[in-house]
Regions:
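Surface-exposed, charge/polar-rich loops and edge strands
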Residues: 1-403
């Protein structure tokens, strides 16, 4: 049964001055709130290796934020902002980023009403030679509301990934209320980001430095990675009072066969770094169920965890994915998830969570509440009254799941 949840029950007062507009000078100097068995204490983030159990697996999302925000201009002079969401033609991220003359993407189009279908030129007010040489253009293929399919074309033989690096800007969250700056290219990106595709950072990972990662390894924890490309839906508030009416956007993810085998055999506690890692890990169970019941993986529906009973164990589910991959000689598996994690969700894989402090009335607050129960209010009250910084560039928390 889909839970009857009112989003107003997950509100809290967040003054604008508590939203971190910029990162601290050092990634690991942020504050860290630890919640375990109803108790709260605080540390500096660089102390996190001391707080973690050594017999655990720590899972990071190694997606990379792309400079997905582009500005074009009509012949009339009107500016049109185009925000790339996901590739359409070619559909695979790596192939689209490797394209050297054209590709099409699903995009959010700012000032959309002013784009009448004419071909746009990239906005280049300073006449930068490298940008001028590309002669980048945008053509509207189709439109649906504020989104549309846009075909980009350019000269010079550059791969599209390089085109974005030269012409685009990092799409920082709207609640920062500022334009993207040079510092964001470095700091709105995790140190271990590897695979391009996200339009928002998995911000729990922004605090990790090489020294912190080395200390975690030295303590004996297993470090693993998954890759979920974070979509623009991560910025969307829950607009309907009834959470059941909130649509989740599909986000693609990839996990490797080696990772699944390690996860299946370790028997250790699992620490997820960020809500995107949680959503990937918890989606795996339903991917495995699909392999058992239909013989193949399928995308995870938003309400799949709540609308039926599941008789399969987590071990059986993971075994089914592994068997499917081995049978088809796959070293990695790609799927999509719309999973929403709300109070009442049964966690099957994740035991601990590293995460920032999230917006009121957001799906991320619902996930935290599902993880720690009603104590989410106590945690957030503590953070507000103890000078913690909030949202993407804010401070961090280490949460133990309420058993």
């Amino acid at each position: 049964m889909i839970p009857d949840i009112r989003i107003e029950d997950y509100n809290y007062p967040l003054p604008d001055e508590r939203i971190a507009k910029y990162p601290l000078a050092e990634r690991d100097s942020s504050k860290l709130l630890r919640y375990i068995d109803g108790k709260i204490d605080e540390f500096v983030f660089r102390q996190i290796p001391e707080l973690l159990p050594s017999d655990a697996v720590m899972v990071f999302n190694d997606t990379k934020v792309v400079p997905a925000r582009l500005h074009f201009v009509r012949p009339t002079g009107a500016r049109i902002e185009i925000f790339c969401l996901q590739p359409v033609k070619p559909e695979e991220y790596n192939i689209s980023f490797a394209a050297t003359s054209s590709c099409s993407w699903k995009c959010v189009i700012g000032n959309a009403k002013k784009w009448k279908g004419d071909i746009l030129d990239l906005y280049n007010p300073e006449n930068a030679p490298e940008i001028a040489e590309m002669a980048m253009k945008a053509r509207l293929v189709s439109r649906e509301g504020e989104t549309g399919i846009v075909e980009f074309s350019w000269s010079g033989g550059y791969p599209f990934s390089r085109v974005l690096e030269i012409c685009g800007t990092i799409p920082i969250p709207p609640y920062l209320n500022r334009e993207s700056e040079a510092i964001d290219s470095e700091r709105y990106q995790t140190l271990y980001a590897k695979f391009r595709g996200s339009v928002a950072a998995p911000t729990a990972g922004l605090h990790f430095t090489q020294a912190v990662l080395d200390a975690i390894r030295s303590k004996g924890l297993d470090i693993e990675t998954v890759c979920l490309h974070v979509g623009a839906g991560t910025f969307l508030p829950v607009k309907n009072s009834e959470v059941a009416k909130h649509p989740m956007h599909r986000e693609p993810f990839v996990v490797t066969l080696d990772f699944l085998k390690d996860l299946r055999s370790s028997g250790k506690s699992v620490i997820a770094v960020g809500t995107t890692s949680v959503r990937t890990l918890e989606s795996l169970y339903y991917i495995g169920v699909s392999c058992i019941e239909t013989g193949a993986p399928a995308d995870v529906d938003q309400w799949a965890p709540y609308t039926r009973e599941y008789k399969w164990s987590t071990e059986e589910s993971l075994d089914a994915i592994i068997a499917y991959m081995e049978k088809n000689s796959l070293d990695k598996i790609s799927a999509g998830t719309r999973i929403i994690i709300v109070p009442g969700f049964r966690f099957r894989i994740v035991d601990m969570l590293v995460t920032n402090f999230h917006q009121p009335e957001s799906t991320l607050i619902l996930l935290v509440s599902a993880f720690v129960g009603g104590d989410w209010k106590t945690i957030y009250d503590y953070a507000l009254s103890h000078d913690f910084r909030f949202l993407s560039y804010g401070d961090s928390s280490l949460l133990y799941r309420r058993k």
